[in-house]
Amino acid sequence: MSKAQKRKRLNKYDGESKTPANKSTVDGGNPYPTLLRPTAEECRDVRDALLSLHGFPPEFANYRRQRLRSFSAVDDHDTQCNLKSETLNETEEESVLDGLVKILLSQNTTESNSQRAFASLKATFPKWDDVLNAESKSIENAIRCGGLAPKKAVCIKNILNRLQNERGRLCLEYLRGLSVEEVKTELSHFKGVGPKTVSCVLMFNLQHNDFPVDTHVFEIAKALGWVPKTADRNKTYVHLNRKIPDELKFDLNCLLYTHGKICSNCKKNVAKPKAKVASPDDCPLVGFYDLIV
């Protein structure tokens, strides 16, 4: 990218406000109130560039269809509870409890291993009641292929025990009727369920416009200059959720995650921000990285 092109694109996105931060300019707790990036236009450009390269990731296509359906129909929450708390059937629309457990099993492991762990859990314990009544060691054995089996088994068991004791049934469908903040409060009561897990449940299973920050999203956001290099994940989550338009959050998040997993150019840029990488033909984010090199 030429210097003139860099200047033109940088001006287009207007990276930082010239107004010094003070109490009146802090955007409701935004940790970086003077950082204007990412702009809505930049988010759209990055989304479109990654969509052209990858297409929409097929592993997230079903969640995308559920989002589209949810915006055009109102669910009967009680009916869903009666149906979805009984079995772990992959052919049905994923329940909130299924989704939460899947996300927990995906922590600190590969996607294929977490999928194998959930499939093994389903095969061993067809109903959530079976999991609740099982010995922790049996749950560990069922999910061992996903890694951290003792820790994850305890977490799953704690969730089920709390649901049974406090609500009388193993179901999280009631979360569909709550606001984002109410969902965060409810899920934070479960030991082992952290902010990223909650955000993933909000986006994938509850169809809220939330933007989870996993390792791939976090590192690319820093490399793009969307947050400072010194940012942590919590501040990145707050900033990106305030700056990225709601209508772009789901697609952009899925695409950044997918791209971060497979793009060697982005891995170089994350490791060494000033490293020379290939052309935009190989990675469409190269031109965006050029803005901050």
From Swiss-Prot:
Binding-site list for DNA: N108, K151, H216, D232
GO BP terms, alphabetized: base-excision repair
Record-linked Pfam families: HhH-GPD (PF00730)
Parts of the chain that traverse the membrane: none
Keyword Hydrolase: yes
EC number: 3.2.2.-
Record family assignment: Belongs to the DNA glycosylase family.
Protein name: Putative DNA glycosylase At3g47830
Source taxonomy: Eukaryota, Viridiplantae, Streptophyta, Embryophyta, Tracheophyta
